[in-house]
Amino acid sequence: MLATVFLNLIKRAFMKKLLFQFDTDLHPSVFDTVVGYDGGADHVIGHGSLTPENIAALVDGTIFTRAPKDKKNTAIFVGGSDMAAGQILFEAVQKHFFPGFQVSVMLDSNGSNTTAAACVAKLASSGILTGKKAVILAGTGPVGQRAAAMLAMEGAEVTITSRQLWNAEKACEAMQKRFNVHIHAQAAADFDERAAAIQDANIVIATGATGVELLKPEHWQNNAALEMLADANATPPLGIGGIGVMDKGIDCQGKIVWGAIGFGALKLALHRACIAQLFEDNKHVLDAENIFALAKKMA
């Protein structure tokens, strides 16, 4: 009897931590797989092209296979390049849960939650966000939208720019619906329009496409209103000319600046910490709000 109990305790102590990677893209993200292992998963099992219509059996497999006290060793990570599709899938996964039968789940499509949270948390550690005017340049992508929402939740007055006004308005509406925050939309199709968009801004974050320069040094370095800038682009040419990719809250022309790798170390540490948290119990639901809260503690 005692031997059986002891054997069961040993089995539980060495029970494998399984992370099921639910990706909306055809091929699950290699980046997310690597960080899943680095975050403490023993095995990462990726599934691609997932939708609310084809996940039922997969979710059932996670919630019905282990005893209640062992369910914490199974978790789900929702990813993919499409944030909107990821949000829908994330919510669909949870609809299959019921009392006693659930596992922890995290949403980080395109790295949007962890990247935005790390960026805004580093800005928050560098200065005051409440009451400041913030502009997210080319902010209609996953990272830009989430960063805008997080800044708004911190009390900043936020504007998202895009080459097309309708695209910026669409992003603002999505964030208002999801987070109940008000964000302004503004068209800014070229250097001059983007320089005009940040004229009165205190905070600027560039979240444009890889290798696209959004501002040149002369567009921001002499702007007396600007206090902090962050560039999420790590591939030359960088999003904001004059900011180094490795910059970590340094003073540049009287402004505090952060480069993509400068706050990227926090992004990776945060991502790993969230994965580890998934295996603490089976009831964690990690999305923008609690991921951002953790980022601020880690910053």
Regions flagged by a language model, labelled:
Residues F98-M106, C252-G254:
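Glycine/charged-rich beta-loop-alpha catalytic/anionic-binding loops adjacent to active sites
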